[in-house]
Amino acid sequence: MPVSTARDRTSWKDPASGYIRRNISPANFPSPIRIVEVTFPAGAKVAYESGARDSSVAQQVWVQDGAIEVTIGKITQKLGKDDCLAMQLDAPVTFRNCTRKAARYIVVLSS
């Protein structure tokens, strides 16, 4: 059974926003589910262009600390600690941290 330990996890820092993405799911395990932890700096913004896909990708965002705004297409949701948003990745998505405190959230993706 694959296990992901803290020392084995990889992370990536976006040079533009300072956002840190850490892969939580065990690497090299064939699963349709991925878990990622994100540390999102105060004042940061990250946008993803998503459109029509061959297969459906679902994502849930669960805020652990702080607050963020998520815009999917033209709809914006404000999320605080312990809020969880479920969405299909079929439209552009923008994440914003409009506060003066870093936010931390968990992303669960299923494809």
Q: What does each model-found stretch correspond to?
A:
Residues 35-38, 86, 100-111:
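A short hydrophobic beta-strand segment most commonly corresponding to one strand
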Residues 1-2:
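Short C-terminal boundary/hinge segments that cap the last helix of small helical domains
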Residues 95-98:
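Asparagine-centered strand-capping/turn motif at beta-strand->loop junctions
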Residues 6, 10-50, 111:
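A short glycine-rich, His/Asp/Glu-containing loop-to-beta-strand
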Residues 36, 49-50, 59, 75, ...:
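Short, conserved secondary-structure segments in the cores of folded domains
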Residues 37-41, 53-70:
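Short, conserved beta-strand element in jelly-roll/cupin
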Residues 24, 73-90:
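Short acidic-glycine-tyrosine-enriched beta hairpin
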Residues 31-32, 56-57, 88, 101-102:
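Short acidic/glycine-enriched loop/turn segments that link adjacent beta-strands
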